[in-house]
Amino acid sequence: MCEYTVGYVDDDITSYNDYAKRLKRRGIELIFPDDRETKEQIFEWVQEKNIKCFIIDYKLNKVFDFSGTELALYLNSRIPDLPCLILTNYPKDAIDGNLVIQNMIENRDIMATSDPEKFEEFLSKVKQSVKVFEKRIENHKQEYKQLLDKKSGNTLSSSEEERFLDLYKLLRAYGEVDDLPAQLLESETSLKMDKLLQSVNNLIEKVEER
């Protein structure tokens, strides 16, 4: 069984099986989001498959309506810590675009390179990216537990409330926390507003009864 599960998306999948076999021998399961056409669908797939690192082709324009960098930016807007490695035949173009940091851009040939040293460096980067993501998830779990305690005691601020819900959605998607009762997922502001509206309704009913 592979220790690492890594996503892979490209608009040319002719070499995917070869890449997958090669990486599997090194403990990395490379999986492709079949039949996912939009950024939202790929985001949902990332969560379903518990992806902790994503290798993305730079252009993608033969099949998708967006580029690899646009997909990476979208995924990082939803999962800020998800490492996305960009593969391209033109690393300088990707670097000059200033949308992805340089150390997350790889020459496309790296997946098929016959240079063992370069391939080992690439594998190390992928595996280390996964470990960094897992460590950050652990840190998020600790923060989530602290906020959950405050939530249970009704002492969350509005900004903490928003952070709590964001962490819950992320950690739940990765199977790191259990489902919470619906009432715990309601914001304190909403609950207070509901109580206020109920009080107003009760007051109106009393006035109308007179």
Predicted regions and their residues:
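Charged, amphipathic alpha-helical linkers/stalks
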Residues: D93-S159
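A generic structural motif
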Residues: R26-P33
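C-terminal output/effector regions of signal-responsive regulators
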Residues: K131-R210
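Conserved acidic segment of CheY-like receiver
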Residues: C2-T14, Y19-L23
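Short acidic, S/G/P-rich loop/turn micro-motifs used as interaction or catalytic elements
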Residues: D12-S15, E37, K59-F64, P91-D93, ...
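Conserved phosphotransfer microenvironments
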Residues: K52-N76
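Acidic, metal-coordinating helix/loop segments flanking the phosphotransfer/catalytic sites
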Residues: P33-C53
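A short, hydrophobic beta-strand element within the central beta-sheet of small alpha/beta folds
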Residues: A72-D96, I105-E106
